[in-house]
Structure formats: structure tokens, C-alpha cells
């Protein structure tokens, strides 16, 4: 659970707010332009921009464990979701991953253009059958283009958990992993809610955000009947790791 911010951090957060807003206004169009000029350049620009803005705000990212990395056969990355800061932290730690995002976010034109440049996939979470079709289409496109389904980040909680809590994991990520035969890579993100609260309104406080890639779980031989057991197992692993302060 996030502890109350120190007074000096509250002041710094107010100073950081316009800095973060300006950073977004500059970075989002840069990502779009870079990706149009050269495939993959948008990701490099995004990672660089995240690192620069984080540094200026007094935020430090740490990466632990072995993530998918270059040449990955494709994994379903399942992190906890405690803060909007989780997304830039993951993008910094593993820039090749692709995110799923609620379709509603794509109604914001500049944000939508940047997300598309990063390969983010809109998902209609109100219709699980349509969401499944969208996921299957994504995997098929990636497999046809690269021979691999790619590394896909799914926030299994379905949204940002209220401060100090964990939401139940939904089954979609695990159904996807079983259908595609991809391993599940649990990820524990710690400190993000102290840096940016769930409803932080760009009030970024100085601090450390740790992204820890845990041991991948093989889904070979599993069927759709096993998705609930797999889901609960991964949730237990992630919850135990996020509770750790080591």
C-alpha cells in the first residue's frame, strides 16, 4: 500500500505536473512522426522520451529478471496494474511489447495516433466475444508478418486497482495464452502507485519504480478448462511478488 507522500514530494509533484503535460504534448506527435518515417522508430523515441521525462521528474526505473527480449517466440505478459505509471515503466523496461487498451481511449485523436504507432490494440471490453475476435485477429496478423504472435501485455485486472488493493484477474489473458500456446510471463510492478496515484492527475512524485519479470509459465498441454487455475496461479505469484519490498 502506498504511504502518504512527504510534504516536499507533494510540492515537487505540483512542479512536475506542467512538465509531464508538456512532455506528453511533445512526445506523442514525435512518436507518430518517427514511426511514419521508419518502422520501429516510434518505440525508440517513446522509450527515450519516457526516460527523459522520468529523470526530470525525479523518477527512476529499475528492471529485474529476464523479460521476453529480442527473438522472443511470443509471450503473454501479465503485470499488476496500480497506476498509470505502469505503462511507461513497462515500455521503458521492455520496449518491444505491445499493449491492449480499452477502445474508449482511441477517441482521443493524438493519443490514438501515438498508440497505433506503438502497435497498441483497441479492445472492446464490454463485449467479450468481440474482444476475443480482436485478440485472435491480432495474433494472426503478427504470426503472418513475423512468424510469432509477439509479446502482448494484458492487464488482467481490467483496469487500475484502487490504492492498496488488487482487483480479481480476468480470464482473457490466460485464454489467449492457452489458445496460442504462448507462455505467460508474470510481472510485478512495485512503487508505481507511490510515484503516481491511481487518480493522480499527472501529479508525479519522485521515487523508484521496479519492473520485475518473474519466471514464465508454460501453457503447453493446457486446455480452456485450465484457464481458471492458470489465472489464479498467476495472480498468486504476482500478488506475492508485489508484496515483497526486496
Language model feature labels by segment:
Residues 49, 86, 101, 110, ...:
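Hydrophobic alpha-helical segments typical of transmembrane helices
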Residues 27, 31-32, 36, 71-128:
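Catalytic core of membrane glycerolipid acyltransferases/transacylases, capturing the structured
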Residues 65-70:
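Glycine-rich helix-loop-beta junction characteristic of Rossmann-like nucleotide cofactor-binding loops
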Residues 2-10, 132-246:
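Non-catalytic C-terminal accessory region of glycerolipid acyltransferases
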Residues 55-64, 167, 193-196:
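Short gly/ser/thr-rich secondary-structure transition/capping motifs
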Residues 3-62, 113-118:
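A transmembrane-helix-recognition feature enriched in membrane-embedded lipid enzymes
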Residues 58-60, 96, 117, 149, ...:
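A generic structural signal for alpha->beta connector loops
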Amino acid at each position: 500500500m502506498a504511504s502518504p507522500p512527504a510534504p516536499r514530494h507533494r510540492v515537487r509533484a505540483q512542479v512536475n505536473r506542467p512538465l509531464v503535460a508538456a512532455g506528453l504534448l511533445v512526445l506523442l506527435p514525435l512518436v507518430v512522426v518517427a514511426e511514419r518515417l521508419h518502422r520501429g522508430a516510434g518505440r525508440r523515441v517513446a522509450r527515450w522520451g519516457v526516460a527523459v521525462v522520468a529523470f526530470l521528474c525525479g523518477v527512476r526505473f529499475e528492471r529485474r529478471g529476464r523479460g521476453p527480449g529480442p527473438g522472443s517466440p511470443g509471450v503473454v505478459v501479465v503485470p499488476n496494474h496500480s497506476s498509470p505509471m505502469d505503462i511507461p515503466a513497462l515500455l521503458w523496461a521492455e520496449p518491444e511489447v505491445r499493449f491492449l487498451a480499452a477502445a474508449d481511449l482511441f477517441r482521443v485523436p493524438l493519443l490514438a495516433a501515438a498508440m497505433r504507432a506503438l502497435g497498441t490494440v483497441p479492445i472492446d471490453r464490454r463485449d467479450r466475444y468481440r474482444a476475443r475476435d480482436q485478440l485472435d485477429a491480432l495474433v494472426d496478423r503478427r504470426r503472418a508478418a513475423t512468424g510469432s504472435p509477439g509479446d502482448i501485455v494484458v492487464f488482467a485486472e481490467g483496469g487500475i486497482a484502487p490504492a492498496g488493493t488488487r482487483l480479481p484477474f480476468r480470464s482473457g489473458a490466460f485464454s489467449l495464452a492457452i489458445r496460442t500456446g504462448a507462455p505467460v510471463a508474470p510481472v510485478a510492478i512495485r512503487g508505481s502507485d507511490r510515484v503516481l496515484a491511481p487518480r493522480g492527475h499527472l501529479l508525479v512524485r519522485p521515487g523508484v519504480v521496479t519492473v520485475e519479470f518473474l519466471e514464465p509459465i508454460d501453457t503447453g498441454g493446457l486446455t480452456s478448462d485450465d484457464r481458471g487455475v492458470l489465472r489464479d496461479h498467476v495472480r498468486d505469484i504476482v500478488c506475492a511478488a508485489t508484496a515483497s519490498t526486496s
